[in-house]
Amino acid sequence: MEFSPRAAELTTLLESRMTNFYTNFQVDEIGRVVSVGDGIARVYGLNEIQAGEMVEFASGVKGIALNLENENVGIVVFGSDTAIKEGDLVKRTGSIVDVPAGKAMLGRVVDALGVPIDGKGALSDHERRRVEVKAPGIIERKSVHEPMQTGLKAVDSLVPIGRGQRELIIGDRQTGKTAIAIDTILNQKQMNSRGTNESETLYCVYVAIGQKRSTVAQLVQILSEANALEYSILVAATASDPAPLQFLAPYSGCAMGEYFRDNGMHALIIYDDLSKQAVAYRQMSLLLRRPPGREAFPGDVFYLHSRLLERAAKRSDQTGAGSLTALPVIETQAGDVSAYIPTNVISITDGQICLETELFYRGIRPAINVGLSVSRVGSAAQLKAMKQVCGSLKLELAQYREVAAFAQFGSDLDAATQALLNRGARLTEVSKQPQYEPLPIEKQIVVIYAAVNGFCDRMPLDRISQYEKAILSTINPELLKSFNEKGGLTNERKIELDAFLKQTAKEIN
């Protein structure tokens, strides 16, 4: 049987099509929404899903799978759940939550998923990093030995912080916790502009959790005016954002900071504040029907903060010698540091800066309680000159606070007690500092040296700030620069400094 030419042509065409036929299917695992409400969706059918995997709803809203149960999956929704209905399709993305990281992020304000919210357009060249990763192991770490200066006399002298340390800032609302954090960012400006290599530069990441949008906008303005935004990243999960984003923001910020840590650079991350993250996590856990524990927090709320703060570390020389320093902030209620979340974070961190309302209202700002504040590892990183100068400072201040409480009751005090009260009042006056005016470490050394060695003892309290300005404006720059060196305060420098301070004190008096 012979085919006509037309039929033969068709046969050839069909044969060629069949031999070149291939399937290019993309198979997505999908599920259906069983119930939705309060930002939680229960989904049936996602049998292969991973814990912490991102999913996408039919409306375009994303979510994260947190509860993997026999019958369904509990998904927390990133955004409004009003567009999600029962029976809607839910698609797996196959990826665990990740965020952009890299130097392209500097100077930008992003949300908890790394999406820019500052109106400056899309992010340029960047890599993506998972928000949840394991902290560096013991072998990969090195003990803290480099200083991380805050620019605050009270902190750098009494509770010094090193690169790679975790130092908690704890206090009631409106006691100046955020002010300490912002001053620390501003203080890096001088170091970063002077630093010729990456080993000196300190990049900053500020994570705002549950704050007002107006507060975040004000912070952006302060950093912009001080030219500090160029080395900073702001991650904002504001009060109007859903609880899952407030829970996720610290991990996202940490992933951005880890980019610098893992590439031999140095970064500082501020979590402001972790109390609000714990509240957001409690909300999610209760809605997911996880059993509540103390103060209705879930049983793993300690792990929530420990796995985050353990990622701040000083890396060993073999792994690049980078570092990530963390300053978590915790808000207390009526000064109660023995509540659940404060005790958890105190036990995780390497020390704490305790702020008190009473000191704040007495005009002692920063309102640091010297007795309760401690730095467990920072003294190893402190400059030698600062260590020499402030050796007796903490003891004298603690004794002063103790004696001052009893001095209110008795009028006839012996000469030694009066001298202690006199010196203590002047040391307290010297530790005061205006907001947004961080001091370089060498200038701090001069001021504290003058106070500890009695150059202010006969001076009226209201003249001390004037004396401080006078010595800082007229001191020999070469002498000032020498305090930054590793040698510390030599006898020749002490003699020169003593003569200068005595002369300036005479002029003020």
Swiss-Prot record:
- Molecular function terms, GO-annotated: ADP binding; ATP binding; proton-transporting ATP synthase activity, rotational mechanism
A biological process from GO: proton motive force-driven ATP synthesis
| InterPro entries, per the entry | ATP_synth_asu-like_sf, ATP_synth_asu_C, ATP_synth_asu_C_sf, ATP_synth_F1_a_nt-bd_dom, ATP_synth_F1_asu, ATPase_a/bsu_AS, ATPase_F1/V1/A1_a/bsu_N, ATPase_F1/V1/A1_a/bsu_N_sf
Marked site (Required for activity) residue numbers: S373
Residue positions annotated to bind ATP are G171, D172, R173, Q174, T175, G176, K177, T178
Annotated membrane-spanning segments are: none
Keywords, ordered alphabetically: ATP synthesis, ATP-binding, CF(1), Hydrogen ion transport, Ion transport, Membrane, Mitochondrion, Mitochondrion inner membrane, Nucleotide-binding, Transport
Pfam families, alphabetized: ATP-synt_ab, ATP-synt_ab_C, ATP-synt_ab_N
Q: Which SUPFAM superfamilies match?
A: C-terminal domain of alpha and beta subunits of F1 ATP synthase, N-terminal domain of alpha and beta subunits of F1 ATP synthase, P-loop containing nucleoside triphosphate hydrolases
- GO cellular component assignments: mitochondrial inner membrane; mitochondrion; proton-transporting ATP synthase complex
The source's domain of life comes to Eukaryota
Where would you find this protein in the cell?
A: Mitochondrion; Mitochondrion inner membrane
Q: What do we know about how this protein assembles, alone or with others?
A: F-type ATPases have 2 components, CF(1) - the catalytic core - and CF(0) - the membrane proton channel. CF(1) has five subunits: alpha(3), beta(3), gamma(1), delta(1), epsilon(1). CF(0) has three main subunits: a, b and c.
Q: According to its UniProt record, which protein family does this protein belong to?
A: Belongs to the ATPase alpha/beta chains family.
According to its UniProt entry, the function of this protein is described as:
Mitochondrial membrane ATP synthase (F(1)F(0) ATP synthase or Complex V) produces ATP from ADP in the presence of a proton gradient across the membrane which is generated by electron transport complexes of the respiratory chain. F-type ATPases consist of two structural domains, F(1) - containing the extramembraneous catalytic core, and F(0) - containing the membrane proton channel, linked together by a central stalk and a peripheral stalk. During catalysis, ATP synthesis in the catalytic domain of F(1) is coupled via a rotary mechanism of the central stalk subunits to proton translocation.
Record-given protein name: ATP synthase subunit alpha, mitochondrial
Q: Which gene encodes it?
A: ATPA
